[in-house]
Amino acid sequence: MSKYAGIVLAGGMSSRFGEPKALASWQGSTFIEHILKVMTSTLQEVVVISHSHIKERVEKLVQVPVIEDIPHYKGNGPLAGIVSGMEYIEADWYAIMPCDAPNVSHEWFTILLEQTSNEYDAVVPIINGRKQPLLAAYHNRVKEKIYTLLQEEKRSMGQLLSQCNVKYIAGEDIQANADWFINVNTKEEYVQAQKDLSNE
């Protein structure tokens, strides 16, 4: 069993963006390819949780396993994706990554995983005052908590965190760059993120 593994969540419908965000162009490739390049430089095992509509397209782009949600919980949001990844790869800790934060750096995963310890169920960054539960790490013991929530038709990350012993880490305390956490939900945000990148 690995100590650490990565789970990339690419199962959302991207309704506000107008097309699958995982496949949006970024620095000569796509969001999903760029994110995986960053993650696989730090983590030996990574799995992508994909929506069935784009699974084949994602598989052609990446060299890691691409799976769908566990059938019983299909479409139940990020909790379903996280638990599906946990079932696919056995590890002590899982670094979670959405497919719409293309600025993420391999440094972030190094910092995040250095903060893990057995006394905690989760390590969650707080960036500019906001919790970032989808750019976080979760111990494998939260798997049972997620199943319980899904069985009760509870789907929010906040409901999971309320049941966990969470280590919250402030971005400024760990030298995390706030730009790593910018997520792209609309075409306007996408254009701005590309402008910011070209101005660096």
Curated annotation (Swiss-Prot):
It is found in: Cytoplasm. It catalyses: Mo-molybdopterin + GTP + H(+) = Mo-molybdopterin guanine dinucleotide + diphosphate. GTP binds at residues 9-11, 21, 69, 100. One of its GO terms (molecular function) is metal ion binding. Pfam families: NTP_transf_3. One of its GO terms (biological process) is Mo-molybdopterin cofactor biosynthetic process. Its EC number is 2.7.7.77. GO terms for cellular component: cytoplasm. SUPFAM superfamilies: Nucleotide-diphospho-sugar transferases (SSF53448). The keyword ATP-binding does not apply. Keywords: Cytoplasm, GTP-binding, Magnesium, Metal-binding, Molybdenum cofactor biosynthesis, Nucleotide-binding, Transferase. It is an enzyme of class 2 (transferase). Its cofactor is Mg(2+). InterPro entries: MobA-like_NTP_Trfase, Molybde_CF_guanTrfase, Nucleotide-diphossugar_trans. Mg(2+) binds at residue 100. The N-terminal domain determines nucleotide recognition and specific binding, while the C-terminal domain determines the specific binding to the target protein. Belongs to the MobA family. PANTHER family: MOLYBDENUM COFACTOR GUANYLYLTRANSFERASE. Transfers a GMP moiety from GTP to Mo-molybdopterin (Mo-MPT) cofactor (Moco or molybdenum cofactor) to form Mo-molybdopterin guanine dinucleotide (Mo-MGD) cofactor. This is Probable molybdenum cofactor guanylyltransferase. The gene is mobA.
